[in-house]
Amino acid sequence: LFRSVYITFADPAFEAYCLEHFDIDHDGRISRYEAQRVLKMDCPDRGIAHMWEIGEFSRLERLDGSGNDLTQLDLRKCTLLQTLDCSRNRIASLDLDGLRALLELNCADNALTLLDLKSAGALRLLDCSGNRLVTLDLRPCSERLKADAGGNPLLTTVYCRASQSVSADGHTEIIVR
């Protein structure tokens, strides 16, 4: 029964990518069975506007969706995700809630005004440069975090721990606590 439940894709470019790489039985459709076998998805620069079905790929450990036309990305069901590159999109909000395994995040060159890292306790590498962030709290992240927050013209304050390495523009105050 599980093998015969198929995913309906809203975005033709995302569907084409998935069919090209994950259609195990070559029937021209992606079943939930096929989706749950996918651990890595590398789909940069493919003109993808929506990945609304990304939650069906719940065993994903790595996702590279950089250089597309994404405005949002709902990863709440992708709780095993360790590496995420969603840079060079138009994402205004990124919900990382529940992504406790996330080690690397590249969300540079988007339209982010807020980046909530409360659930990102394992995060070791962050590039959030080139956004519209106003404040950034890195304290919930790994004490070995390396972060690049440059190119955020509205960023006034970054909160971090003494053991974390943070780079930001000269107008940004870095407060160590």
What annotation goes with each model-predicted range?
Residues F2-R62, T79, S142, P153-R177:
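N-terminal capping/linker segments that flank leucine-rich repeat
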Residues L39-P44, E61-G65, Q82-C86, L103-C107, ...:
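Conserved hydrophobic beta-strand positions in leucine-rich repeat
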Residues R46, N68, N89, N110, ...:
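Consensus "Asn ladder" position of solenoid repeat domains
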Residues A49-I54, L73-L75, L94-L96, L115-L117, ...:
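Canonical leucine-rich repeat
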Residues E56-R59, L80, R90, A101, ...:
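Glycine-centered tight turns that cap/initiate beta-strands
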Residues S66-D74, C78-S93, L99-D109:
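A generic tandem-repeat structural signature
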Residues L75-L80, L96-A101, L117-A122, L138-E143, ...:
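Right-handed parallel beta-helix/beta-solenoid
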Residues L103, A122-R124, G170:
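Short stretches within intrinsically disordered, low-complexity N-terminal or propeptide regions
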